[in-house]
């Protein structure tokens, strides 16, 4: 592992107690403790703040006297890595240069001894290296000038435009350029970049090769492109192909909203998808963060922990903190005395931090080289904390002197990095001339770039393979593979009974297919056709309701403890890729990851399943900003499938509601599909159709829970899997005389079966029960055709289990009015509006359900076995709403 780098002595334990009697301790040990003190604590006094406003604590361990050593004391033998030091004083100077300069190492969160040794070795070996060549330094100066010039041009032309200036951290541009060059050195061919809006426009032009004229036009309120763009320019992504001395690197800057840090899991999901398809060695995720957001946003901590799990690891991410030491108007200063930094959340995941002064570009480049080497060797996260300042306010509409007058006075007197770096180069051409040249390059040099960036380009459509024809023989073959037990393995009795039932089912064309079997057969048939399937979420291997059983845990004990068999991964040699990943207990990071995965793997069926649909609101940012709006804003097409177990069963407001109404409120422009299948065959066809759709769209499924999974009436015949496709509307096949029907009750989901039981028990042939299986895009034509078959129809009722302020009613009302035949009246029967939602009493829930069904089918009658008191008042909370009055 270390063949490319020199070996260094293993650091000894860190000494915290002052040495009072050095004569009793061997001198090599004292020197080792002195060196170790700098390795572990030197960053606390390092010269990493350009403004030098951060408090510098007294760290006595960094003084030779603390260890009983005198500065003029000779070193008896040369020290590996410090051969030029002849005395303790010279050693101290050397250690200060290495660990207390403009680049400092913080490995306080790294518990792995091997990684710490490597980091110490790299710091000690590179500190003596000569600065970059004059040519390299001139190139860096050019990059800094380009960054500075961009900010000045935008400020002059569009003084009122928000650009989220990079001024104070312009070194980010040479940093990102160096990352790309170093990535090429390591054989990276795909670099996935995520970053917030601070400095993004600058990076689009100066890193992503975007046309300056194009970006300026997006800022011009009078331009045609500004009038037609679907998102703000500092949210847009781009893709470019960069040439490096070691080969070409394709760099993709991911689109993202203003919701800070949300793009982080998206980028690592995209990276993992690329790695799964092409090999993990060729792809690098790089995420740029703001200091306040990195410390403050929970999605950061969730994702840092998520990627430590094998199913979500992108083999290490390079993090870059643009640390301007302030968040909006709130100071976010380093506190070395209290050991408080914006990167502290990364200590929990063993990530080292390279802290570097943004006014020292040469050290910035050294930090990049060390960080990339570390990531490639250890396949682990590492952070570069680029410490600068914010010359202007949060945005150009801000007046920072209102809240930070003293800080702004210091910043106003501080020279820019271009001036400082130009001065360090000595005999370089006059700066005024260089700035004029940089302006010409900016205005004229990007438009004709041969590898110009593609902005807001649509993600490539999936090259889907048509679904192969299904036959009973094929399903039997797949069932044999699904139920095959590896030789010598003992499986759980429950699994044995289940697989026996599946074999019996497929042996009979009229056999009833349970939901678990239908889902597994859907995946198996897709995999057999060469499609890939990825399914992740909490407990997805077994399923929250013991409804999937895609992972079998061996019951043998002994050396088989923990061993599993995944039947869907062992169907045949030529099958598609199947991944099933039990996620940690997080929604936000996982949903963001899977969305990113779906973008980079459009040919795969990528699925996230919530433990209960209610918990999807823990990931609301990704629903609102990415899934619902990503295609319209950025052209990002995704076939991500979101399964939300949904339905009122008397288990309370936290385990009943997939927020159907909220999803429907987000529906527009055919941005996604929302479905609520009521049979196992529908479930089977829905999943297969989603995988094969030529134009990918996200699919939101109000999926079954315990009652529907166990309802035998929802289990379709085996022949239903062989025929047809997903039906957006299901007709009432029990109606024998359509002219007798006076009322049609429409519903979606399991409430249909409660309505059917009550209707059939009453023997009422004047009521037809029609299921709307897809709620968006709403099947107007299909439903109009069904309703048109009932020539004497008087009333259409929409019945839903959900409260009137939730569920589908307020969305479907306009759709139903558009297809209502003649003089029919439209009403809705729902639970009454409620702030919390479902009832937590099973008895009260059942009484509510009976009253709801009775109201939907006829006159509002008291439920059988009704009770007085609080329950009765809740039972009365069923609303029958006339559409015109709603």
Question: What is the predicted function of each stretch?
Answer:
Residues 34-50, 174, 178-207, 260, ...:
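Conserved phosphate/anionic-ligand binding catalytic regions in large, soluble enzymes, centered on
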Residues 3-6, 12, 31-41, 45-98, ...:
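Glycine/aspartate-rich loop-and-adjacent alpha/beta segment that forms the canonical ThDP
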Residues 314-433, 636, 648-659, 706-886:
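Thiamine diphosphate
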Residues 527, 541, 560-744, 748-750, ...:
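ASCE RecA-like P-loop NTPase motor cores
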Residues 2-171, 188:
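Extended, charge-enriched "interface" segments that sit outside catalytic cores
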Residues 189-350, 354, 545-601:
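Cofactor-binding active-site loop characterized by glycine-rich and histidine/acidic residues
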Residues 428-533:
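Hard-cation-handling environments
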Residues 128-150, 216-268, 272-276, 694-761:
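Active-site cores of enzymes that catalyze phosphoryl transfer or operate on phosphate-rich substrates
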């Amino acid at each position: 592992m270390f063949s490319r780098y020199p070996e260094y002595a293993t650091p000894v334990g860190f000494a915290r107690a002052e040495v009072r009697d050095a004569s009793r301790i061997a001198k090599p040990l004292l020197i080792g403790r002195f060196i170790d003190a700098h390795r572990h604590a030197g960053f606390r006094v390092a010269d990493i703040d350009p403004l030098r406003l951060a408090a510098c604590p007294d760290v006595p361990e960094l003084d030779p006297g603390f260890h009983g050593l005198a500065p003029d004391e000779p070193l008896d033998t040369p020290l590996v890595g410090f051969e030029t030091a002849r005395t303790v004083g010279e050693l101290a100077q050397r250690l200060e240069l290495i660990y207390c300069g403009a680049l400092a190492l913080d490995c306080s969160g790294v518990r792995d001894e091997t990684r710490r040794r490597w980091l110490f070795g790299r710091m000690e070996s590179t500190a003596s290296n000569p600065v970059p060549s004059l040519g390299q330094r001139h190139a860096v100066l050019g990059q800094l000038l380009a960054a500075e010039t961009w900010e000045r041009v935008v400020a002059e032309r569009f003084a009122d435009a928000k650009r989220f200036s990079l001024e104070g951290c312009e070194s980010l541009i040479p940093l990102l350029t160096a990352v790309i060059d170093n990535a090429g050195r390591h054989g990276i061919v795909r670099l996935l970049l995520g970053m917030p809006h601070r400095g993004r426009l600058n990076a689009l032009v100066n890193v992503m090769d975007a046309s300056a004229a194009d970006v300026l036009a997006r800022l011009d309120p009078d331009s045609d492109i500004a009038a037609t763009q679907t998102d703000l320019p500092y949210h847009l992504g781009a893709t470019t192909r960069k040439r490096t001395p070691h080969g070409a690197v394709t760099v993709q800057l991911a689109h993202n909203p203003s919701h800070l840090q949300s793009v982080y899991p998206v980028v690592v999901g995209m990276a993992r998808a690329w790695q799964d398809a092409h090999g993990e060695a060729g792809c690098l995720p790089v995420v740029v963060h703001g200091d306040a957001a990195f410390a403050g946003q929970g999605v950061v901590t969730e994702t840092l922990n998520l990627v430590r799990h094998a199913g979500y690891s992108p083999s290490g991410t390079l993090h870059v903190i643009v640390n301007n030491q302030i968040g909006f108007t709130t100071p976010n200063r380093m506190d070395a005395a209290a050991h408080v930094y914006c990167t502290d959340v990364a200590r929990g995941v063993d990530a080292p931090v390279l802290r570097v002064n943004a006014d020292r570009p040469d050290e910035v480049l050294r930090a990049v080289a060390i960080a990339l080497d570390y990531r490639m060797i250890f396949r682990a996260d590492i952070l570069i904390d680029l410490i600068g300042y914010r010359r202007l306010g949060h945005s150009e509409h801000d007046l920072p002197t209102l809240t930070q007058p003293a800080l702004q006075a210091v910043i106003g007197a501080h020279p820019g990095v271009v001036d400082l770096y130009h001065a360090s180069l000595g005999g370089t051409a006059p700066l005024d001339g260089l700035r004029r040249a940089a302006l010409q390059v900016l205005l004229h040099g990007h438009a004709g770039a041969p590898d110009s960036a593609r902005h807001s380009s649509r993600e490539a459509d999936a090259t889907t393979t048509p679904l192969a024809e299904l036959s009973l023989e094929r399903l039997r073959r797949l069932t044999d593979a699904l139920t095959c037990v590896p030789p010598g393995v003992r499986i759980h009795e429950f699994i044995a009974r289940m697989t026996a039932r599946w074999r019996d089912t497929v042996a009979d064309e009229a056999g009833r297919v349970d939901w678990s079997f239908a889902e597994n057969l859907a995946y198996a048939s897709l995999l057999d056709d060469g499609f890939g399937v990825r399914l992740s979420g909490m407990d997805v291997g077994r399923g929250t309701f013991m409804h999937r059983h895609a992972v079998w845990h061996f019951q043998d004990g002994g050396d088989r403890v923990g061993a599993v068999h995944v039947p869907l991964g062992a169907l045949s040699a030529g099958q598609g890729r199947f991944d099933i990943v039990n996620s940690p207990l997080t929604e936000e990071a996982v949903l963001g990851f899977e969305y990113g995965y779906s973008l980079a793997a459009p040919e795969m069926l990528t699925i996230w399943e919530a433990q209960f649909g209610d918990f999807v609101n823990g990931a609301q940012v990704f629903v609102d900003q990415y899934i619902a709006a990503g295609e319209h804003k950025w052209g990002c097409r995704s076939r991500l499938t979101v399964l939300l177990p949904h339905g009122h069963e008397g288990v309370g407001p936290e385990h009943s509601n997939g927020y159907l109404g909220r999803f429907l409120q987000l529906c527009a422009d055919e941005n996604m599909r929302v479905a609520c299948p009521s049979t196992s065959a529908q479930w089977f066809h829905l999943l297969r159709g989603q995988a094969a759709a030529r134009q990918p769209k996200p699919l939101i499924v109000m999926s079954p829970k315990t009652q529907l999974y166990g309802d035998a009436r929802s289990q379709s015949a085996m022949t239903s899997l062989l025929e047809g496709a997903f039906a957006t509307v299901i007709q009432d096949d029990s109606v024998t005389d359509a002219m007798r029907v006076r009322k049609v009750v429409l519903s979606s989901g399991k409430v249909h079966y409660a309505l059917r039981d009550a209707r059939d028990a009453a023997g009422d042939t004047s009521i037809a029960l029609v299921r709307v299986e897809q709620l968006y895009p709403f099947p107007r034509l299909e439903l109009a055709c069904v309703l048109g078959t009932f020539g004497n129809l008087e009333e259409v009722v929409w019945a839903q289990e959900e409260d009137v302020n939730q569920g589908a009613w307020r969305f479907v009302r306009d759709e139903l009015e558009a297809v209502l035949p003649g003089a029919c009246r439209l009403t809705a029967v729902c639970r009454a509006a409620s702030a919390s939602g479902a009832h937590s009493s099973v008895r009260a829930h059942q009484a509510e359900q009976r009253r709801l069904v009775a109201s939907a089918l006829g006159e509002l009658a008291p439920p059988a076995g009704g009770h007085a008191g609080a329950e009765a008042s809740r039972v009365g909370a069923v609303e029958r709403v006339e559409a015109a009055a709603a």
